[in-house]
Amino acid sequence: MAKVCYFTGRKTSSGNNRSHAMNSTKRTVKPNLQKVRVLIDGKPKKVWVSTRALKSGKIERV
């Protein structure tokens, strides 16, 4: 299973590192995902959730 937020869909994105000489190298920017037990259809399930979604208070932990 890929590391993608179950609720918000946040996932790894790509960008560039830039040096002082403006040379570029590829880099990845990863979201802060935590594995959390939540109720889905009345059953507890472990899913990856972004901390932004957790802080919003819309997610009920089990």
Curated annotation (Swiss-Prot):
UniProt entry keywords in alphabetical sequence: Ribonucleoprotein, Ribosomal protein
Biological processes annotated in GO: translation
Disulfide bonds: none
Gene Ontology CC annotations of this record: ribonucleoprotein complex; ribosome
SUPFAM superfamilies listed in its UniProt record: L28p-like
Bias-annotated ranges (Polar residues): 10-26
One Pfam match: Ribosomal_L28
Spans annotated as Disordered: 1-28
GO molecular function: structural constituent of ribosome
Family membership noted in the UniProt record: Belongs to the bacterial ribosomal protein bL28 family.
UniProt protein name: Large ribosomal subunit protein bL28
Organism: Enterococcus faecalis (strain ATCC 700802 / V583)
